[in-house]
Structures are given as C-alpha cells and as structure tokens.
C-alpha cells in the first residue's frame, strides 16, 4: 500500500510539473518509447530532425540516432551547478556524435544567480571545448524555469546580453532556448536583446508521446525580440535508442560536411560544432 501511494505521488508530481523543470535523470517513470524521427510533411527540404539531451552516452547510441533519421543532436556544455561549470560530459558526447556523422549543436544552462557574470560563464564553455580540441561556431542559451532566475527583469536581460556579447566577440552565432511564457516571466517580454539572435522555442503539453505537439513551426507566434523561429522542441522526456531525450525540428543551416567514417581522435583532428541551424 505504501509503495502504491509513493508511485501515485511521483506520477502526480511529474504530471503537474512544467515539463522543462523535470530532471530527466529522475523521470524514468514517465518515459515513453518514441518512434524514429518524423517525416517532414510540409515538403520543405530545409527542415530537419534533432534530439537534445545531457546524459553521457556512447557511439553506439549516436549511431542508433543516426539510423533513426535524426540529423542533429543538441548537447549541453554548461551546467548551473554552484556558480556554473563546464559540463565535461559533453566532450565524449561530441566526439561520439561526430564519429557517428551527426551534426552537433551546443547549449548552455547558465547560472543567473552566480558570482560570475554571464560573459565569464560563456568563457568557461568556450575554453572548455577549445581545450579539448573542439571548435565551437554557435551556442544556445537556455532561458527557462523562471523560479531559477532573480525577480529582476532588467538584471536578467543584462545577464543574457552579457553572454550574447561575449559569444559574438568570439564570432559565434547565438540562439536562445525559451518560450513566450518563460521569456515574459524572466525578462518582462523584453525586446532589448542584441541583434541576430536565433530562437529555439518549446511547446509541449506534457512529458512523453502523449504530450507532443506537431513537429512544425505552425504554432509559433512572435514575442519579445523574436519574429521567427529556428528550432522547435515539440516533445519532452521520451526514449529513443534507449536514451531519454527531447525531440526537435529545426531549420537547416549550411554546416561543414560531417565525417562519413569513425574519427580517430588520436590523430588530433579538430572537431567543429555548430552552424547546423539556419536563421
């Protein structure tokens, strides 16, 4: 009886939590098996399929994702733990994805209440990748979960712009992962964001396949500084290739060709990530 009550309580918490606030490491009970990447039904050859995740995984899983018709993986490179830190798990994930011939994008979950400024957190990500032989061409900044941000829209906008400005100094393209609600709560729906920033928005009804929305941009509505979208996250907390992921659709950019054969990292080859998403 106690176990039944505990299970019911966990399910209630998962069903009532906002999806991006669920820690996927703790959400196995809500996982559902997803099919392979959906066929793009709008006859638009400039659209592609992707997944995003933060777990460490291996090249076999990356090969499986490739066979399941996903073209790009979004991998976390910065965690908000403490003052914020480089996510060392991304190094192996990037190398494995590169070996599998997948396109790679990197996102950061910054720590807005850190003693470090936004630009300093971006430096940690940039240097962490560069020191591991990985060149970064674009970065995505996660701006979600308003409870984790100060109740100060002006300070939050300044923090975000600090990251963007530093990234642009490095010559990186920049995108923001958010949605209309999160952006409004965190920034007061500010449009005072540095120019040429892409949008990756999320719209789901809940975790698992039953919470999916359509893998198109048809539901996008302009907000803040964002007049169009580059990526949509339409599914969260699903299992693909025995890995808990979120699923996305994106506008295709013009990247360098991905390798067709497994990479021998002992050769010292420089991996380049980013640039797979168009604006």
Curated annotation (Swiss-Prot):
InterPro entries reported for this sequence: GH25_Enzymes (IPR051595), Glyco_hydro_25 (IPR002053), Glycoside_hydrolase_SF (IPR017853)
Work out whether the entry's keyword set contains GTP-binding: no
Kindly indicate whether the keyword Signal belongs to this entry. Answer: yes
Coiled coil segments of this chain: none
What do we know about what induces or represses this protein's expression? Induced in response to Gram-positive bacterium P.aeruginosa infection and to mitochondrial stress in the intestine. Induced in response to Gram-positive bacterium B.thuringiensis (B-18247) infection.
Explain the consequences of disrupting this gene: Reduced survival following bacterium B.thuringiensis (B-18247) infection. RNAi-mediated knockdown causes a reduction in survival following bacterium P.aeruginosa infection.
Q: Where is the Ch-type lysozyme domain?
A: 47-265
The record's annotation in CDD domains points to: GH25_Lys1-like
Molecular function (GO) terms for this protein are:
lysozyme activity
Q: Which family does it belong to?
A: Belongs to the glycosyl hydrolase 25 family.
* Descriptive protein name: Lysozyme-like protein 2
